[in-house]
């Protein structure tokens, strides 16, 4: 199983004081050195954390691959074609939200998403759609030509009872298997921590997890190398469980 380390909140800390540090590039290189299989960045329309220059700098510095999260806008499409990341994950975006609140509604935007997917695919960029684990959305993702889906794990991570967490887990598990049966590559992420990652990592249909906020929070106490190492180890051990 692959680990994508999201470095958005390295930029959040930097921007809080308007300084040049901590460096997203340095964070990306440290994460790679200590187990990250890819680096994920979300260039939001309001540029609240990652800036345009960060994306170019990280793309040019890393040895693994860049997964660029972006909204379904012409501006972001143009940026992606300039940066040329290995992967683009199209996500829903609202300016007033603190973080991404739900999955992309592919059903409601099939024509536009299909157009973006074709343009990016023709440019050699693999497209992923960040969606809820809903069979209709998963089928729509396949219909628009996206080869990859990233299942939104936020409801699982935020569940306030064990019963609700189990319900959300089963939804993700079923969605992952359905997507896999359709021939889609399945990733997952949002809200995952060292404490809740194991069940998700046990779903064999899921190939990659993208994790950011909790890793950066852990890094405040453990250091980024150890935070990445522990997450990677937790994912590895989960795969060994019956």
UniProtKB/Swiss-Prot annotation:
Catalytic activity, as annotated: 3-amino-2-oxopropyl phosphate + 1-deoxy-D-xylulose 5-phosphate = pyridoxine 5'-phosphate + phosphate + 2 H2O + H(+)
Domain of life, per UniProt, equals: Bacteria
What keywords were assigned to this record?
Cytoplasm, Pyridoxine biosynthesis, Transferase
Pathway in which the depicted protein is active: Cofactor biosynthesis; pyridoxine 5'-phosphate biosynthesis; pyridoxine 5'-phosphate from D-erythrose 4-phosphate: step 5/5
UniProt-annotated binding residues for 3-amino-2-oxopropyl phosphate: 6, 17, 191, 212-213
Q: Name one GO molecular function term.
A: pyridoxine 5'-phosphate synthase activity
Provide the active-site residues from the annotation. 42 (proton acceptor), 69 (proton acceptor), 190 (proton donor)
Q: Name one Pfam family in it.
A: PdxJ
Q: Where in the cell is it found?
A: Cytoplasm
Q: Report the EC code(s) recorded for this entry.
A: 2.6.99.2
The residues the record assigns to binding 1-deoxy-D-xylulose 5-phosphate are: 8-9, 44, 49, 99
- TM stretches of this protein: none
Disulphide bonds in the chain? none
Q: What does this protein do?
A: Catalyzes the complicated ring closure reaction between the two acyclic compounds 1-deoxy-D-xylulose-5-phosphate (DXP) and 3-amino-2-oxopropyl phosphate (1-amino-acetone-3-phosphate or AAP) to form pyridoxine 5'-phosphate (PNP) and inorganic phosphate.
Task: Give the UniProt family note.
Answer: Belongs to the PNP synthase family.
The subunit structure is: Homooctamer; tetramer of dimers.
Name listed for the protein in its UniProt record: Pyridoxine 5'-phosphate synthase
Q: Which organism is it from?
A: Neisseria meningitidis serogroup B (strain ATCC BAA-335 / MC58)
Q: What is the lineage of its organism?
A: Bacteria, Pseudomonadati, Pseudomonadota, Betaproteobacteria, Neisseriales
